[in-house]
Amino acid sequence: FFAAVEMRDNPALRDIPIAIGGSRERRGVISTANYPARKFGVRSAMPTGMALKLCPHLTLLPGRFDAYKEASNHIREIFSRYTSRIEPLSLDEAYLDVTDSVHCHGSATLIAQEIRQTIFNELQLTASAGIAPVKFLAKIASDMNKPNGQFVITPADVPAFLQTLPLAKIPGVGKVSAAKLEAMGLRTCGDVQKCDLVTLLKRFGKFGRILWERSQGIDERDVNSERLRKSVGVERTMAEDIHHWSECEAIIERLYPELERRLAKVKPDLLIARQGVKLKFDDFQQTTQEHVWPRLNKADLIATARKTWDERRGGRGVRLVGLHVTLLDPQ
């Protein structure tokens, strides 16, 4: 989205690899990249130095968050012409419930098509869309025909679509979970449909139920137009437990750019109420520690993590490290 705004405002950038991010000299990271840059392997959260090695002729831009926010607000206003049931996820993504919409004869497919065309007509930006009977399938569908298309999963399509859908496509299934599922012989939603729910609950806890429900096409979450994102976080579960502070610090160094990128999508000025860290130990007990802080700050997060590591670990191995921020109350 950021790259699309830059290419719109400067057409000379359209056909060349560009990325939004910090400079190599300041050990910056890539926030996002356009499709020509992605062909070279440039990705979000990648160190700028690595991106420039992959793509030496990459054009690096510092980012104009006011312009991105302005475009996002305009897009949100277009959404509101079709429904009041809008659940924003970030500057460039939202769920819309058009069940009761009278536009386009009530056709969700035609509404999505018209919204995409309106966005292009009024902002000269392309958009992709996913149409489905439940939220998680709409999210998956939205990725099927990027960067400028849409994909429809009708209620009748759901059973066949799920049979071959890789579990890694389900929101919340990361590399570690996918590997554990693979070890159980579970690769697709069709595989999980044959699995006992009790087995999943024993192996994955509450997430086991979510996994089972999604594999059946069940997602009872409504589109919440009152939704206000209260926090942003990022975490990593290690393949093997760590036992040394230097390992933990290295993980935080890798997680921080991703936290910064996610926060920038919902709060471009990076202003926050609190920030903190989470450690989960080898006995699955976990601890969090946070305190008031006005702006995202890596040095403070590292100091907080070190204090937590020293005072609460008690010699246990650490299996997960997480960083999070609590957003300011707009009221």
From Swiss-Prot:
<keyword id="KW-0235">DNA replication</keyword>
<keyword id="KW-0239">DNA-directed DNA polymerase</keyword>
<protein>
    <recommendedName>
        <fullName>DNA polymerase IV</fullName>
        <ecNumber>2.7.7.7</ecNumber>
    </recommendedName>
</protein>
<dbReference type="InterPro" id="IPR043502">
    <property type="entry name" value="DNA/RNA_pol_sf"/>
</dbReference>
<dbReference type="InterPro" id="IPR022880">
    <property type="entry name" value="DNApol_IV"/>
</dbReference>
<dbReference type="GO" id="GO:0046872">
    <property type="term" value="F:metal ion binding"/>
</dbReference>
<dbReference type="GO" id="GO:0042276">
    <property type="term" value="P:error-prone translesion synthesis"/>
</dbReference>
<comment type="subunit">
    <text>Monomer.</text>
</comment>
<comment type="function">
    <text>Poorly processive, error-prone DNA polymerase involved in untargeted mutagenesis. Copies undamaged DNA at stalled replication forks, which arise in vivo from mismatched or misaligned primer ends. These misaligned primers can be extended by PolIV. Exhibits no 3'-5' exonuclease (proofreading) activity. May be involved in translesional synthesis, in conjunction with the beta clamp from PolIII.</text>
</comment>
<dbReference type="GO" id="GO:0006260">
    <property type="term" value="P:DNA replication"/>
</dbReference>
<comment type="similarity">
    <text>Belongs to the DNA polymerase type-Y family.</text>
</comment>
<dbReference type="GO" id="GO:0003887">
    <property type="term" value="F:DNA-directed DNA polymerase activity"/>
</dbReference>
<dbReference type="InterPro" id="IPR053848">
    <property type="entry name" value="IMS_HHH_1"/>
</dbReference>
<dbReference type="InterPro" id="IPR017961">
    <property type="entry name" value="DNA_pol_Y-fam_little_finger"/>
</dbReference>
<dbReference type="GO" id="GO:0003684">
    <property type="term" value="F:damaged DNA binding"/>
</dbReference>
<keyword id="KW-0234">DNA repair</keyword>
<dbReference type="InterPro" id="IPR050116">
    <property type="entry name" value="DNA_polymerase-Y"/>
</dbReference>
<keyword id="KW-0238">DNA-binding</keyword>
<dbReference type="Pfam" id="PF00817">
    <property type="entry name" value="IMS"/>
</dbReference>
<dbReference type="Pfam" id="PF21999">
    <property type="entry name" value="IMS_HHH_1"/>
</dbReference>
<keyword id="KW-0548">Nucleotidyltransferase</keyword>
<dbReference type="InterPro" id="IPR001126">
    <property type="entry name" value="UmuC"/>
</dbReference>
<feature type="active site">
    <location>
        <position position="93"/>
    </location>
</feature>
<keyword id="KW-0479">Metal-binding</keyword>
<keyword id="KW-0808">Transferase</keyword>
<dbReference type="InterPro" id="IPR036775">
    <property type="entry name" value="DNA_pol_Y-fam_lit_finger_sf"/>
</dbReference>
<keyword id="KW-0227">DNA damage</keyword>
<dbReference type="GO" id="GO:0009432">
    <property type="term" value="P:SOS response"/>
</dbReference>
<dbReference type="Pfam" id="PF11799">
    <property type="entry name" value="IMS_C"/>
</dbReference>
<keyword id="KW-0963">Cytoplasm</keyword>
<feature type="binding site">
    <location>
        <position position="92"/>
    </location>
    <ligand>
        <name>Mg(2+)</name>
    </ligand>
</feature>
<keyword id="KW-0460">Magnesium</keyword>
<feature type="site" description="Substrate discrimination">
    <location>
        <position position="2"/>
    </location>
</feature>
<dbReference type="GO" id="GO:0005829">
    <property type="term" value="C:cytosol"/>
</dbReference>
<keyword id="KW-0515">Mutator protein</keyword>
<dbReference type="InterPro" id="IPR043128">
    <property type="entry name" value="Rev_trsase/Diguanyl_cyclase"/>
</dbReference>
<feature type="domain" description="UmuC">
    <location>
        <begin position="1"/>
        <end position="174"/>
    </location>
</feature>
